[in-house]
Amino acid sequence: MKFSQLYAPTLKEAPADAEVISHALLYRAGFIRKIAAGVYSYLPLAKRTLSKIEAIVRKEMNEIGAQEVSMPVIQPAELWKTTGRWDDYGPEMMKLKDRHERDFTLGPTHEEVFTHMVKDELRSYKQLPLFLYQIGPKYRDEIRPRFGLLRAREFIMKDGYSFHDSDQSLNETYEACKNAYRKITEKIGLKYIIIEAASGAIGGNESHEFVSFAPVGETNLLKCEKCGYSSNDEQAPYRGKYHRDEEIEKPVELIHTPNVRSVEQVAEFLNVSKNKIVKSLLFIGRNGFVMALIQGDRELNIEKLKVHVNDQSLRLAEPDEVLQAFRVPIGFIGPVGIEKVHVVADCGIKYMKNVVVGGMKKDYHYINANVGRDFSPDSYTDLRVVQPNDPCPVCGEQLTGSKGIEIAQIFKLGTKYSKAMNALYMDDKGEVKPFIMGCYGWGISRTMAAIVEQLHDEDGILWPRSVAPFELIITVVSAQDQDQRIFAQKLYNSLLSSEIDVLLDDRDISPGMKFKDADLIGFPLRITVGKSLKEGMVELKSRNSSKSIKVSAELSKINSVLFKMLEEYNPHERV
């Protein structure tokens, strides 16, 4: 490919809405362009990198016996209603109606569609296990699309589904896929960690995430340096000791707290510490309102709450919904005297005394409220977001924290979907049973962004060789110099015959602009054909190095050096 023919519009400045480096650099380097919030076009450079990521994923999936298919993006509501997820999935599901007023969704995931496809075809245990996958677009109506490709409304994903006749068979495929994902991540060139994860709206009883390290990641990682335990803050259980107040219970009082709503404001106004305040958070689910109580200095884990009340549709109530239902603004809601609401409290609440809670009246809070006397939760469970310095749930050592980007997740689904959809087979004893299933996702477009978050410098992107849009670029310093043009073309043809993915920058622009574009786009290797050609030399420079080396302008010598440089190239190391 010649740069003069390549559609790669580079920019000096990032778009104003670029909050993270991957968004800024992919936009500036001519990989993506925004169509609407969370919706992007992939330009030729992006397509080349995405295709290479897909090829790595496809190869490893095929090697463990998975078979590729292509499923429809548009899915009828009936399938999702069968499993209950039409309502449970939440507002992130993109729903639409056809001209006949029939409900459909643009698939955020494909459990129902895959199960529906095989349910009438797989009849016997002899046809199991079966592992199918696809690579294609997914859709989620993010409430606030941001961070470029990291939280988009449309994204590219590999999703796979396996069908089994035993837990042992599922476990074997699950481990095979986990190992394949390790190989994929290493071939792509990311530094990563595997952690225990929550199953969320997908369901199942076991899940793991592959998370690439990045300071802007939305995944909060927790790790124990002593025993090796790792998880994210959605999944990690709290195993610390709860503080037990030994105070004498005081009389409860309703105090005027004008326009004081947040925990911080309440603590300052009443001159109390945050751990003497109980936050009351209202959620709406299938069965109405749920109130969650958590200590004021801790964050609530909504995933734990969803599991406890068995309702994945649970969402935080809007201010107008709270006001309409209780005639009380958010910020003054509390558990004292509230009716027809299921109240779930964090386990630590039962040991607190003389706490501050919302007064169920605008501009009022209760002080000295006590569990059992003034309010009684319907149930207790662990609702805390586990934080760095909390004890490890395995060995008790303090946990350390870091940030990361989830690039893949695998699930043991069990029989959740097969039971709901009556997807049955006959086992070796003649008994009819539901399939045991697994699910295996990989974010293709998200991976491209994760690479940039991890591998960049002040000049641009540093692509790993395996996924770079081109492995190297030949830069012709002067397009007007016939000798440079002829030699560069000769070198270009030679590299093409060696099956090197090469781009020839033949544009008639300044050398400085060419060098800046090469660094911005992030080609692993640059060969400069310039003035030194008159001395019989060309210059080779790795993207991760500040130094270039001169090599004799003989094709055999150039090939020998560049192959060695490409083999040794490691974008994680600066040399």
UniProtKB/Swiss-Prot annotation:
It catalyses: tRNA(Pro) + L-proline + ATP = L-prolyl-tRNA(Pro) + AMP + diphosphate. Transmembrane segments: none annotated. GO terms for biological process: prolyl-tRNA aminoacylation. Its EC number is 6.1.1.15. Its main location: cytoplasm. GO terms for molecular function: aminoacyl-tRNA deacylase activity; ATP binding; proline-tRNA ligase activity. Keywords: Aminoacyl-tRNA synthetase, ATP-binding, Cytoplasm, Ligase, Nucleotide-binding, Protein biosynthesis. It comes from the Bacteria. CDD domains: ProRS-INS, ProRS_anticodon_short, ProRS_core_prok. InterPro entries: aa-tRNA-synt_IIb, aa-tRNA-synth_II, aa-tRNA-synth_II/BPL/LPL, Anticodon-bd, Anticodon-bd_dom_sf, Pro-tRNA-ligase_IIa, Pro-tRNA-synth_IIa_bac-type, Pro-tRNA-Synthase_IIa_type1. It is found in: Cytoplasm. Pfam families: HGTP_anticodon, tRNA-synt_2b, tRNA_edit. It is an enzyme of class 6 (ligase). PANTHER family: MITOCHONDRIAL RIBOSOME PROTEIN L39/PROLYL-TRNA LIGASE FAMILY MEMBER, PROLINE--TRNA LIGASE. Catalyzes the attachment of proline to tRNA(Pro) in a two-step reaction: proline is first activated by ATP to form Pro-AMP and then transferred to the acceptor end of tRNA(Pro). As ProRS can inadvertently accommodate and process non-cognate amino acids such as alanine and cysteine, to avoid such errors it has two additional distinct editing activities against alanine. One activity is designated as 'pretransfer' editing and involves the tRNA(Pro)-independent hydrolysis of activated Ala-AMP. Homodimer. This is Proline--tRNA ligase. It comes from Pseudothermotoga lettingae (strain ATCC BAA-301 / DSM 14385 / NBRC 107922 / TMO) (Thermotoga lettingae). The lineage of its organism: Bacteria, Thermotogati, Thermotogota, Thermotogae, Thermotogales.
